[in-house]
């Protein structure tokens, strides 16, 4: 079945496999394509084709990730699988593959391991809203050890609940056996995908959210007024809509008197489109790149937040030395850099290149911020880290 024949008449969901190294994430990804290919809903992808991951860049950071697509009878899925732990951290923090939900793969023989816990915490920090658990390698458990699996399940449920993931379904199976064609275990993979269908809700589409456009450029057109250009991040804007300009200065309200695309007048602009908006009563000096134009009161300007951050290693062209509380890099949000001061949490003396850390930031100017938003950290124009806002403070 070629890529082109995938019909887009089903809701689209982004998911990924997360979990400890060697617990079977990639094997499960391959097993899902095997199970669904039997129903003509996927192209079978073997382990090596998924494991051999291409490099991609997100927010100036190189990430290895494999993208697989498949369908269930109800939905179309894009599934991301990463080879190494550092790639998961980078992938989740940069939002390279924004996940609507995740499949947490845990080996029944090992139970929850350090990276299991780290991935659950990371999922919470970056705003992955739902998790479904696949308890893998169940074929390795002898009958006398069967009770241990119940304990592993209990421990997992507690661990997930601690981080705010309540009542996650847990499906037992064997990815390897399913991949080898064992019918009973293929059925378990189908059961897993049914649980994913049922427990990971379809996200609200970008077009249905409140209007927001980051401003990339500002022009003044003589006799007509000021035009701001950018790519609409979400929602719809129509001529004569009331909007606000938020960030960098005091919030201003104005009215959209024109929407243009490729020099043509349009009645409206929609999520994903590059447009110019003509704004009533706004001078060229009242507005600048880095502000957003949005539905009134849908976004507020903020200066202080907590964030989950990945700091690039030297080999990834990051810093060569650690940084400390008081460090003042630039934080790049949407279309602009703003200087901010870092405060490390108690007990953390310094941050080394390659670390994955949570800290607070105080910006010198207000920016339109929201929890779950991604940003890059830059020094002199080069990226040295990436982050996600986990909590707005002020």
From Swiss-Prot:
<dbReference type="InterPro" id="IPR009001">
    <property type="entry name" value="Transl_elong_EF1A/Init_IF2_C"/>
</dbReference>
<dbReference type="InterPro" id="IPR004160">
    <property type="entry name" value="Transl_elong_EFTu/EF1A_C"/>
</dbReference>
<dbReference type="InterPro" id="IPR027417">
    <property type="entry name" value="P-loop_NTPase"/>
</dbReference>
<dbReference type="InterPro" id="IPR005225">
    <property type="entry name" value="Small_GTP-bd"/>
</dbReference>
<keyword id="KW-0547">Nucleotide-binding</keyword>
<dbReference type="GO" id="GO:0003746">
    <property type="term" value="F:translation elongation factor activity"/>
</dbReference>
<dbReference type="InterPro" id="IPR009000">
    <property type="entry name" value="Transl_B-barrel_sf"/>
</dbReference>
<feature type="region of interest" description="G4">
    <location>
        <begin position="136"/>
        <end position="139"/>
    </location>
</feature>
<keyword id="KW-0342">GTP-binding</keyword>
<comment type="subunit">
    <text>Monomer.</text>
</comment>
<dbReference type="GO" id="GO:0003924">
    <property type="term" value="F:GTPase activity"/>
</dbReference>
<dbReference type="InterPro" id="IPR004161">
    <property type="entry name" value="EFTu-like_2"/>
</dbReference>
<comment type="function">
    <text>GTP hydrolase that promotes the GTP-dependent binding of aminoacyl-tRNA to the A-site of ribosomes during protein biosynthesis.</text>
</comment>
<keyword id="KW-0963">Cytoplasm</keyword>
<feature type="binding site">
    <location>
        <begin position="19"/>
        <end position="26"/>
    </location>
    <ligand>
        <name>GTP</name>
    </ligand>
</feature>
<dbReference type="GO" id="GO:0005525">
    <property type="term" value="F:GTP binding"/>
</dbReference>
<feature type="domain" description="tr-type G">
    <location>
        <begin position="10"/>
        <end position="204"/>
    </location>
</feature>
<protein>
    <recommendedName>
        <fullName>Elongation factor Tu</fullName>
        <ecNumber>3.6.5.3</ecNumber>
    </recommendedName>
</protein>
<feature type="region of interest" description="G2">
    <location>
        <begin position="60"/>
        <end position="64"/>
    </location>
</feature>
<dbReference type="GO" id="GO:0005829">
    <property type="term" value="C:cytosol"/>
</dbReference>
<dbReference type="Pfam" id="PF03143">
    <property type="entry name" value="GTP_EFTU_D3"/>
</dbReference>
<feature type="region of interest" description="G1">
    <location>
        <begin position="19"/>
        <end position="26"/>
    </location>
</feature>
<dbReference type="Pfam" id="PF00009">
    <property type="entry name" value="GTP_EFTU"/>
</dbReference>
<dbReference type="Pfam" id="PF03144">
    <property type="entry name" value="GTP_EFTU_D2"/>
</dbReference>
<keyword id="KW-0648">Protein biosynthesis</keyword>
<dbReference type="InterPro" id="IPR031157">
    <property type="entry name" value="G_TR_CS"/>
</dbReference>
<comment type="similarity">
    <text>Belongs to the TRAFAC class translation factor GTPase superfamily. Classic translation factor GTPase family. EF-Tu/EF-1A subfamily.</text>
</comment>
<feature type="binding site">
    <location>
        <begin position="81"/>
        <end position="85"/>
    </location>
    <ligand>
        <name>GTP</name>
    </ligand>
</feature>
<dbReference type="InterPro" id="IPR033720">
    <property type="entry name" value="EFTU_2"/>
</dbReference>
<feature type="binding site">
    <location>
        <position position="26"/>
    </location>
    <ligand>
        <name>Mg(2+)</name>
    </ligand>
</feature>
<feature type="region of interest" description="G3">
    <location>
        <begin position="81"/>
        <end position="84"/>
    </location>
</feature>
<keyword id="KW-0460">Magnesium</keyword>
<dbReference type="InterPro" id="IPR041709">
    <property type="entry name" value="EF-Tu_GTP-bd"/>
</dbReference>
<dbReference type="InterPro" id="IPR000795">
    <property type="entry name" value="T_Tr_GTP-bd_dom"/>
</dbReference>
<dbReference type="InterPro" id="IPR004541">
    <property type="entry name" value="Transl_elong_EFTu/EF1A_bac/org"/>
</dbReference>
<feature type="region of interest" description="G5">
    <location>
        <begin position="174"/>
        <end position="176"/>
    </location>
</feature>
<dbReference type="InterPro" id="IPR050055">
    <property type="entry name" value="EF-Tu_GTPase"/>
</dbReference>
<keyword id="KW-0251">Elongation factor</keyword>
<keyword id="KW-0479">Metal-binding</keyword>
<keyword id="KW-0378">Hydrolase</keyword>
<feature type="binding site">
    <location>
        <begin position="136"/>
        <end position="139"/>
    </location>
    <ligand>
        <name>GTP</name>
    </ligand>
</feature>
